[in-house]
């Protein structure tokens, strides 16, 4: 009986924790394996991902993956992105195409903004 009670308590706590977790915004990084600018951007995107656990990062290779390429086309069409060049960074309704180390990091950080402050529980 105690085992069942303990299991029920843990199950209830799991549902409460899942219910409190808000969905995260998605940052899309579309790249090509043959693109030198994409390779230059990758370490920055990895760093950004570590800094911002509040955002879900999706790194999608488009030259060898038809599903990723189709998603890229769909997102580009919706946002009015012309040309389909990579790297392309998309966050919510904003986008940046291209990357040059030292020039784009600030623009990308500004695009995603600062993390929301969590409310202080009393």
Question: Which sequence ranges carry the predicted segments?
Answer:
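Positively charged n-region of N-terminal signal peptides that target proteins for export
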Residues: 1-5
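Bacterial N-terminal signal peptides
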Residues: 7-14
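Sec/Tat signal peptide C-region and signal peptidase I cleavage site
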Residues: 15-19
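Local sequence-structure signature of Cys/Sec-based thiol-disulfide redox active-site neighborhoods
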Residues: 20-58
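Extracytoplasmic/secreted envelope proteins and their assembly/folding machinery
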Residues: 41-45, 69, 73, 105-109
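Thiol-based oxidoreductase modules, predominantly thioredoxin-like and allied folds used
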Residues: 54-70
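Thiol/disulfide oxidoreductase modules built on the thioredoxin-like
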Residues: 75-85, 96-102
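Non-catalytic, surface beta->alpha helical segment in thiol-disulfide oxidoreductase systems
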Residues: 90-121
